[in-house]
Regions:
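Acidic, glycine-rich segments characteristic of secretory precursors and extracytoplasmic regions
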Residues: 17-71
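TPR/Sel1-like alpha-solenoid repeat signature
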Residues: 141, 214-221, 233
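Bacterial Sec-dependent N-terminal signal peptides
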Residues: 1-26
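Conserved, well-structured interaction surfaces
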Residues: 41, 49-53, 80-155, 178-182, ...
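Short coil/linker segments at helix-helix boundaries
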Residues: 157-181
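Elongated scaffold/linker segments in the mid-to-C-terminal portions of large proteins
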Residues: 44, 53-58, 74-78, 83-107, ...
Length: 295
């Protein structure tokens, strides 16, 4: 009897599980996120606003190697006193396809175009007020258009992933480089589409609005030498409802007390101290006389 009991107990112990599907915690499951307005807001902040940050060595506005810094380093606008393989090729125009600072803005941020495309699809099915949905979708369109323009300005036409391909990430699909017409149509369409849901001027510091959209459109049209449309955008920004104007003192634009002043069209938000004196450390010579420990 004891042998039979032990046998039954062993058989029970050897019983296997029937559900072997593990739950992943390192990726967003669209089956249960986003499901409400709060989720959709979080998805836009994390998927659309994320690349437009300045976090030391991360973000398209990084003070170390952003689009602007790398672009300006290839001119006489910016200078870096660090003598290494990162900066010298930029100042001497001797970069190659393997030069990290030449390619990092593509390798780090092109993927966000796919993230924004998926974000646009996912928030479109979330129940929320029409006004809020229009705003979040407009912000996503602006993010896609702006990032695509930055990448286009640096690298020319780039691959633009389709929603179908993004929903099937395990398929081995190599997206072709967009044609010149496809690229420019994508940028212009995204930016103009964003105008439908954005406020004229946001009351939330650091968020996108029509003023920013028209500014990027103006720069894009200038890039394409479409001077008539560029002028239209510029004249739009002069209208009183945008509230833009010049500060009496140039230095006052950047003081903490004047945060969000009338001369700022868009400001990248970050925690205070994140980039404290970072570019001074790059640009000033090693024997610069200062008592500032951050330099």
């Amino acid at each position: 009897m004891k042998k039979l009991l032990y046998t039954v107990m062993c058989c029970c112990a050897l019983a296997s599980c029937t559900n072997l599907d593990s739950e992943r915690y390192d990726a967003i499951n669209p089956d249960f996120f986003p499901t409400n307005e709060k989720d959709a807001e979080a998805l836009v902040v994390g998927g659309v606003y994320a690349p437009f940050r300045s976090a030391e060595y991360s973000g398209v506005f990084s003070t170390a190697h952003s689009f602007q810094v790398i672009g300006d380093m290839s001119t006489d606008i910016a200078v870096c006193c660090w003598v290494n393989d990162s900066w010298i090729p930029l100042t001497t125009h001797n970069w190659t396809p393997n030069h990290s600072y030449t390619t990092l803005n593509y390798t780090d941020y092109a993927k966000y175009l796919g993230t924004m495309t998926l974000t646009l699809d996912r928030i479109s099915n979330v129940e929320m007020s029409d006004e809020k949905k229009a705003l979040l979708m407009a912000e996503t369109h602006l993010g896609r258009g702006w990032l695509a323009f930055l990448l286009y300005d640096f690298y020319g036409p780039i691959p633009i992933p389709t929603l179908e391909d993004l929903k099937n990430p395990l398929d081995e699909v190599i997206e072709p480089r967009a044609t010149q017409e496809e690229m420019t149509n994508f940028i212009e369409t995204e930016l103009t589409e964003s105008l439908k849901g954005l406020p004229t001027r946001t009351t939330q510091f650091g968020r996108f609005d029509k003023g920013l959209a028209y500014t990027i459109l103006m720069k894009y049209y200038m890039h394409e030498k479409n001077w008539a449309k560029a002028e239209e955008c510029g004249r739009e920004l002069l209208k009183a409802e945008y509230g833009y104007g010049l500060m009496d003192r140039y230095a006052d634009i950047f003081t903490l007390e004047n945060e969000g002043n009338k001369e700022i069209i868009f400001a990248c938000t970050e925690e205070r101290g994140t980039n404290l004196q970072l570019w001074h450390d790059h640009a000033l010579p090693g024997n610069y006389p200062t008592k500032n420990a951050s330099i």
